[in-house]
């Protein structure tokens, strides 16, 4: 079977990619997620007045923790030694939303895109969890890879991120 999917062998069976022969290079990935809230919920979040406490600090910690565990929760992902992981927030009051940007880095022979994506998703889920007592219809959207650099495939920028 001829497949362009890297996690399938010649017979179409699922397999973990052998990255042992790949060159170790600096790998960087940035992903985003957007959390849409009602104005009153965002106001409580920013005032640190929600019942569960400081939402953004917990979301940052949760996202970083998730980035470090991707090899355990995403099938066929290699466990990586991250050299850097960070979560940044861009808060908008109109429309009321929080844009999450997750950045991950390593020096290794496989990329860190999944680590960045899972970190952004998890930070968004933490925000949902900590705000759900006051709002159940929170929307998590626009989870995507914005940028990756390093390795054989080179650099990628999401189409609307091109300069």
UniProtKB/Swiss-Prot annotation:
Under InterPro entries, the record lists: MoaC (IPR023045), MoaC_bact/euk (IPR047594), MoaC_sf (IPR036522), MoCo_biosynth_MoaA/MoaC (IPR050105), Mopterin_CF_biosynth-C_dom (IPR002820)
Instruction: Alphabetically list the UniProt keywords.
Output: Lyase, Molybdenum cofactor biosynthesis
Catalytic residues at 129
Task: Report if keyword Heme is assigned.
Answer: no
Q: Where does substrate bind?
A: 76-78, 114-115
Pathway of this protein? Cofactor biosynthesis; molybdopterin biosynthesis
Per the UniProt record, which EC number(s) apply here?
4.6.1.17
Say if the entry is tagged with keyword Electron transport. no
Q: Which reaction does it catalyse?
A: (8S)-3',8-cyclo-7,8-dihydroguanosine 5'-triphosphate = cyclic pyranopterin phosphate + diphosphate
Q: Which GO terms describe its molecular function?
A: cyclic pyranopterin monophosphate synthase activity
Gene Ontology biological-process annotations: Mo-molybdopterin cofactor biosynthetic process
Quaternary state and partners of this protein?
Answer: Homohexamer; trimer of dimers.
Recorded family membership: Belongs to the MoaC family.
Q: State the protein's purpose.
A: Catalyzes the conversion of (8S)-3',8-cyclo-7,8-dihydroguanosine 5'-triphosphate to cyclic pyranopterin monophosphate (cPMP).
Q: What is this protein called?
A: Cyclic pyranopterin monophosphate synthase
Organism expressing this protein natively: Desulfovibrio desulfuricans (strain ATCC 27774 / DSM 6949 / MB)
């Amino acid at each position: 079977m001829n497949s362009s999917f890297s996690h399938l062998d010649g017979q179409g069976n699922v397999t973990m990619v052998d990255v042992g022969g790949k060159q170790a290079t600096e790998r960087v990935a940035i992903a985003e997620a957007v959390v849409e809230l009602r104005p009153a919920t965002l106001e409580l979040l920013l005032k640190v007045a929600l019942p569960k406490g400081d939402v953004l600090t917990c979301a940052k910690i949760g996202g970083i923790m998730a980035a470090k565990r991707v090899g355990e929760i995403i099938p066929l992902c290699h466990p990586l030694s991250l050299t850097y992981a960070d979560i940044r927030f861009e808060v908008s009051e109109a429309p009321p939303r929080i844009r999450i940007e997750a950045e991950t880095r390593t020096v290794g022979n496989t990329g860190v895109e999944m680590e960045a994506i899972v970190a952004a998703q998890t930070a968004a889920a933490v925000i949902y969890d900590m705000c759900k007592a006051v709002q159940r219809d929170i929307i998590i959207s626009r989870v995507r890879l914005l940028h990756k650099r390093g390795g054989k495939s080179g650099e990628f920028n999401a189409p609307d991120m091109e300069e």
